[in-house]
UniProtKB/Swiss-Prot annotation:
Compositionally biased spans, kind Polar residues: 229-248
Protein name as it appears in the record: Bcl-2-like protein 13
Organism: Homo sapiens
Top-level taxon in the UniProt lineage: Eukaryota
Bilayer-spanning residue ranges: 460-480
PROSITE patterns to which the protein is assigned, alphabetical: BCL2_FAMILY (PS50062)
One GO cellular component, as annotated: mitochondrial membrane
Reported tissue expression: Ubiquitous, with the highest levels of expression in heart, placenta and pancreas.
Motif stretch (BH2): 193-206
Gene Ontology molecular function: any one: cysteine-type endopeptidase activator activity involved in apoptotic process
């Protein structure tokens, strides 16, 4: 703060009043339990505390006399200066409940706590030598290096009050000299800053700001930064990889928001978050899914991302490449493996379902289950296909979904149906003889053609029935296994 040789007369009066008001706080404060020791190191005892009461009373009386002298000086100079104490915010605050003494006391206490060590060192240096303005100025300037802003203004006031108490205890009367030290120092080194801030009346605003924002000057390393709500709807990519979890970041298109990543992960960009609802499904598959809906709700929601949507035209080709359970067995092997397997209702097996692959050259029948990941390949002889086509009233397009509670026919009913099929098979085989090359050709599991002798009569029907029984038994087992999963 630069030195100022001349200041306005009103500022001089206000500065003098500020110094007297702050020094007068000694008589209003309670004695502390511990006082600064004297230069000889003698501690004050209980008897000396009563002496301090007398000292404080004496200081109060002297300050009151100085204030009366200041009022008289202002009144006498009014005609020449035009300064009216009633218009000054220092002498007459706008708020009657607040006073300059109270504001200075609060600010001075804060400075005393923040600069405790530098102030104590400066006080000891001043008390160890004769009291002069030059010594006071040097010690004050060294102490203000540790302060900034209005705290620099409070440093000389705090030193003056402590010096007044100690020198009065020694029996001296330093009030007049210390008052002059304070006024001169403030006018020389602080006047420019105070005037730029708006004068001494700014002290009241400093007090009100600290009451409204108690932590405004404190530095807090745990500040909480609140993001504005304007851009709350926009989700920007996080800067740190630790913030984003792998299930949100893997295979996520840029156009998709983070809130939809759990059910759009690994989906094509063309498919929206609700595209799975628009894919056409088989009626029997819908029925099967509805029956298992309660059990599937308990599964992890993240499994929705594993659903693979396949067009209906791609199902036959995909089943051949990625079928989980596919069984292609000759009729003889099925008969040997399951000789006593119960047969389900044969009328439900129709000609269209037996020719599901729509490829007459290979004679492979695909039985579609409720799960698109499972397929069952069954091979039947030409005789069995011809026998099945003789019942046009039983033609259906889709094999009904197999239920675990399906009722099986008894042995008598099976024998009766076999006999009826034999009777129907005889005229059909006589009208349309099957070439030996077609009857003997079969598809092995590896896809190679192998010759097979054509069975005649009832043995063909028995072998075909056993094959159908085995096929349906395997299909039921696969369906139950998939539902348990």
């Amino acid at each position: 703060m630069a030195s100022s040789s001349t200041v306005p007369l009103g500022f001089h009066y206000e500065t003098k009043y500020v110094v007297l008001s702050y020094l007068g706080l000694l008589s209003q404060e309670k004695l502390q339990e511990q006082h600064l020791s004297s230069p000889q190191g003698v501690q004050l005892d209980i008897a000396s505390q009563s002496l301090d009461q007398e000292i404080l009373l004496k200081v109060k009386t002297e300050i009151e006399e100085e204030l009366k002298s200041l009022d008289k000086e202002i009144s006498e100079a009014f005609t020449s200066t035009g300064f009216d104490r009633h218009t000054s915010p220092v002498f007459s605050p706008a708020n009657p409940e607040s006073s300059m003494e109270d504001c200075l006391a609060h600010l001075g206490e804060k400075v005393s706590q923040e600069l405790k060590e530098p102030l104590h060192k400066a006080l000891q240096m001043l008390l160890s030598q004769p009291v002069t303005y030059q010594a006071f100025r040097e010690c004050t300037l060294e102490t203000t290096v540790h302060a900034s802003g209005w705290n620099k203004i409070l440093v000389p006031l705090v030193l003056l009050r402590q010096m007044l108490l100690e020198l009065t205890r020694r029996g001296q009367e330093p009030l007049s000299a210390l008052l002059q030290f304070g006024v001169t120092y403030l006018e020389d080194y602080s006047a420019e800053y105070i005037i730029q801030q708006g004068g001494w009346g700014t002290v009241f605003s400093l007090e009100s700001e600290e009451e409204e924002y108690p932590g405004i000057t404190a530095e807090d390393s745990n500040d909480i930064y609140i993001l504005p709500s304007d851009n709350s709807g926009q989700v920007s990519p996080p800067e740190s990889p630790t913030v984003t979890t792998s299930w949100q970041s893997e295979s996520l298109p840029v156009s998709l928001s983070a809130s939809q990543s759990w059910h759009t992960e690994s989906l094509p960009v063309s498919l929206g978050p609700e595209s799975w609802q628009q894919i056409a499904m088989d009626p029997e598959e819908v029925k099967s899914l509805d029956s298992n809906g309660a059990g599937e709700k308990s599964e992890n929601n993240s499994s929705n991302s594993d659903i693979v949507h396949v067009e209906k035209e791609e199902v036959p080709e995909g089943m051949e490449e990625a079928a989980v359970a596919s069984v292609v067995l000759p009729a003889r092997e099925l008969q040997e493996a399951l000789p006593e397997a119960p047969a389900p209702l044969l009328p439900h097996i129709t000609a269209t379902s037996l020719l599901g692959t729509r490829e007459p050259d290979t004679e492979v029948i695909t039985v579609e289950k409720s799960s698109p990941a499972t397929s069952l390949f069954v091979e039947l002889d030409e005789e069995e296909v011809k026998a099945a086509t003789t019942e046009p009233t039983e033609v259906e397009e889709v094999v009904p979904a197999l239920e675990p509670t399906e009722t099986l026919l008894s042995e008598k009913e099976i024998n009766a149906r076999e006999e009826s099929l034999v009777e129907e098979l005889s005229p059909a085989s006589e009208k349309k003889p099957v070439p030996p090359s077609e009857g003997k050709s079969r598809l092995s599991p590896a896809g190679e053609m192998k010759p097979m002798p054509l069975s005649e009569g009832k043995s063909i029907l028995l072998f075909g029935g056993a094959a159908a029984v085995a096929i349906l038994a395997v299909a039921i087992g696969v369906a139950l296994a998939l539902r348990k999963k």
